[in-house]
Amino acid sequence: MIDLSQLSPMMQHYMETKKEYPDCVLFYRLGDFYEMFFDDALTVSKELEITLTGKDCGLSERAPMCGVPFHALDSYLYRLVQKGYKVAIAEQMEDPRQAKGLVKREVIRVVTPGTITSSQVLDETKNNYLMGIVYMDGIYGISTADISTGDFMVTEVDSDRELFDEINKFSPSEIICNNAFYMSGVDMDELKNRYQVVISALDSRFFGEESCRRILMEHFKVGALVGLGLEDYATGIIAAGAVMQYIYETQKSTLEHITTITPYSTGQYMVIDTSTRRNLELVETMREKQKRGTLLWVLDKTKTAMGARLLRACIEQPLIHRDEIIKRQNAVEELNMNYISREEICEYLNPIYDLERLIGRISYKTANPRDLIAFRSSLEMLPYIKRILGEFNSELLAELGREPDPLQDIFQLIGDAIVEEPPITVREGGIIKDGYNQEADKLRHAKTEGKNWLAELESKDKEKTGIKTLKVKFNKVFGYYFEVTNSFKDQVPDYYIRKQTLTNAERFTTDELKQLEDIIMGAEEKLVSLEYDLFCEVRDKIGAEVIRIQKTAKSIAGIDVFCSLSVVATRRNYVKPSINDKGVIQIKNGRHPVVEQMMRDDMFVANDTFLDNGKNRLSVITGPNMAGKSTYMRQVALIVLMAQLGSFVPAQEADIGICDRIFTRVGASDDLASGQSTFMVEMTEVANILRNATRNSLLVLDEIGRGTSTFDGLSIAWAVIEHISNSKLLGAKTLFATHYHELTELEGTIAGVKNYCIAVKEQGDDIVFLRKIVRGGADKSYGIQVAKLAGVPDSVIARAKEIAEELSDADITARAKEIAEISSNITQHKAVPKPDEVDLQQLSFFDTVKDDDIIRELDSLELSTMTPLDAMNTLYRLQTKLKNRWKETG
C-alpha cells in the first residue's frame, strides 16, 4: 500500500486522479508526454512493448514509469483499447509556464472500444458502434450509437437469435448491459469470442427508467418521448438512455452532434440471420475475414467514407417494400443513362472528406486547424454536385439534388479565418489569417517588427564587435541569444552575459537583446493565445450548424451510393430487375457477382432459375461435389438480395419476388467453442429455419443430413423437404442441394418439388463439369471421379471402385421408391394434417417397428434438458445397439 503522504505533490495528484478512475489506465500529461506510473506503467509497458523506467516520487524507491509522446497518442491509445482496456486521459488545463505551483490537470475523457473518435485509427469505411443491451421481462432493448458520426438507433427483440442477428449486423466494438442481461441465459463467452467484443455490465444507476427517459428528453429537447417515436419501445428507451449516460460520463461532452434517434423494427428490412450473413459473405469472407471476395467488395465503388458506410448498411439491410426498391432502381438507371454526368459527379465526390466524422470532432472540440481546411475543401465541391443533380428527374436523385446545403456561410467563414496551410496543433499560433481580427493583426505586426529589430541588432553588433559569425538565435529554453563560435570568443565584449557553453560555441545575451526579447515574446505569447481563442470561436460557430452539416453529409453519402451501384452495373453488364409481389423468382442467365469478378472474362457459366409459391417452390439439386451446386444457390440468394437493396443484378433478365427473409444452411463446420459437432450445428440451423421461415422466405439448403449416417441423413433430408414443400406448413421457395440422389423420387409425389442437376460430361472414367443447371435428377454422385480429380492415388481409386460395386445402394434406392409411392398415395387420398396432427410414422424407414425398444427410448428422451454432449453420446449408444441387432439378424 502506497503512503500518499510521502509522495511528491504531483504524484499525490496522480494517485487521487487514479482513485477516481480505478478501472482505467490513466494517461497523465507531463509536458510533451503522457506518463503512466506504478501498476499502470507495468501494464502498459508490457502490452505496448515500451521501455519501463522510473521516477523519483518521494518514496524510498522510484515509481515505475513509462510514457508515450503526446503527438502519437492516438496510435498507442488505439492499441491499448483494442486489447480491452479503458483509458482515462488527464490533460494539462493551463500553460505550465504560467502556472503558479502545481499545473492544473483533469480527466477530459475516457476512451473505450466503442468511444474512439480519432480518424487516424478508425476504419473510414466502417462505423464504430457502441451497443447498449437491456434485458427486462423477456424483452431485449437494443440501442446502437456511433459517436464518431452521430448515428443513434433503438429497437427491441424478444429472442436470443434475433439479438445475435442485430449484434452480427452492427458488429459493435463494445457492449454495455444491465446485470439482468448476464442472467438472461445468453452465452456470454460465445458472444465475446464470436464477435470479439468487449462487454461490460454497468451499475444499476444507468438503467433507471425515469432517469433514462429524462436524459433523452433533455438531450433532444422534447417534452415527451412520443415526439421521438419511442413510445412503443419501453425497454429500448432504457437501453438508449443508458448509452447516452455512458457517453456523457466517458466523453464529458454535450454530444451536440447526436441530433436524432432512429427507432426501427427488425421487420422493416429483409431479415438476414447470422448464419446467412456468414454463408453469403456479404461484407467479410468466412475464412480470411477480409473485404476482398465479398458482395461489398464487388459493389463498393464509392468515393467518400460516408458513402462506403452507407453502402455497407444497405447491404446489411435490404428493403422489403416494392415502392422503395423501385425508387432506388430508378436512381441507378438514370445515372446509367447519363454516364458523363455521373462521371463528373464522381470526380467532385472524390476530394470530399468524411464530413460526418469531421463534424463529430468539431462538436467534441477535438478538431484541429487542418480539419477545418479539409472541411472547407470538401464544401468547395458541393455547388458543382448540386448543379449536376439539378439535371436529373428520378424521385430520389431530384430529392438529393434539392437537399445538399452548399453551406456557403461556413465555407466563407473558414476561408476568411484560417490560413491555407495551418499547423496541426492549436496552441502554437500560425492559424489565423491576416485581416480577420484587428488585435491579432497588431500583435502580428509587433512580432514582425521585432524580427526586423533583431536583424538590425545582429548587424549592428557584428560591426561593433568584429565577430563575423555572430548570430541571433532562439530556442524555447533560453529564448533569444547571441551565438559566437569558439574561434571568435576572445573578441566577445565584457557587457555580453554568458548563458550557455557548447562544444564549438558559446551563447550570450545583452541588456538590449533582453528588452527586445520581452517585447517580441510578449507579442508572440499574446498572439498565440488570441489565435487559439479565435480558432475555438470559429470551430464553435461551425459546430452550431451541426444539423445542416449532417443533412448535407447524408445527401452526399446517398449520391455516392447510387453512383457506385451505377458504375458497377454498367461495367459488369448488370440489368434492372423487375420487382413483383407475387412470389415469383425468375432469373435468366444469372451469374454469381463475386465469382464472376474473380474469374477471367467469359469464363463464368450463367444459369436460369424459376421459383414460385406454387408448382415450382422447391428445387432439389443433385450432382457431384465441385460441380457448382453451392455457387449456384448462393448466386440466386445474392441476386435476390441485390435486387432488394435497389441494385441492378448480374443476369440477362430478372423478375424478383420480394422475400421477407433469406435463410442459408451451407457447408459444414464444428462449433468447437460451444461444444457442438458438425451435425448438431447443422440441425440447430435447420431448426431455426423451419421455425422462423415464412411462405415469402427464400431458403438455401446445402447437403442437409451430411453430418450423420446415410440412413439418418436421408431420412432427415426427406422429412425436411416434405415439411418445407407443404404449403399448409410452410411452402417457402427453396433451393435444396443434396448428394442423396434418392430424393429425386419426390418429384411427382410431392406438389411443388422439381428436380435439377448439374450437367456432367463423361469421357470414359473421367468427367467434365459443365456448370450448367438442367432439369432432371442425377442418378449417381461421381464421388470416385471427383476423388480422382482431387489427386487421390490411383491405387486408392481402383480399390474404391471395387468396394463401390460390393456396397451397391440399390436397396436404399428401391426403398426410396416405395416410400415415394406411399407418399403419393397418402397425398392423393388424405387431407394434409395440421402440424400438431402429423403422423410421426408417416414415410418412416422404420414404420414396422413402433413397438421396438429403441423407438420407445427415443420417444422418452427429454431433449430440452440434454446437453449437446449427452445427445451425441445417446445417439452413439443407440446407433451401436441398432448395428449389433443388424449383425445378429444377418
Enumerate the predicted regions with their spans.
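C-terminal tails and terminal domains of large nucleic-acid-associated
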Residues: 844-890
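ATPase nucleotide-binding head domains, primarily ABC-like/P-loop NTPase cores
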Residues: 38-41, 233, 303-304, 314, ...
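Active-site phosphate-binding and catalytic loops of NTP-dependent enzymes
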Residues: 90, 113-122, 254, 392-396, ...
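Amphipathic heptad-repeat alpha-helical coiled-coil/stalk segments that mediate oligomerization
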Residues: 207-213, 222, 270-274, 282, ...
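Amphipathic alpha-helical coiled-coil segments
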Residues: 325, 332, 342-348, 375, ...
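Charged, surface-exposed helical/loop "interaction arms" that form contiguous linear patches used
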Residues: 354, 364, 368, 378-381, ...
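Conserved catalytic alpha/beta cores of large enzymes that bind or transform nucleotide phosphates
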Residues: 167, 172-180, 186-189, 201, ...
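Charged catalytic and DNA/RNA-contacting regions of genome-maintenance
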Residues: 1-334, 350-363, 367-459, 827-836
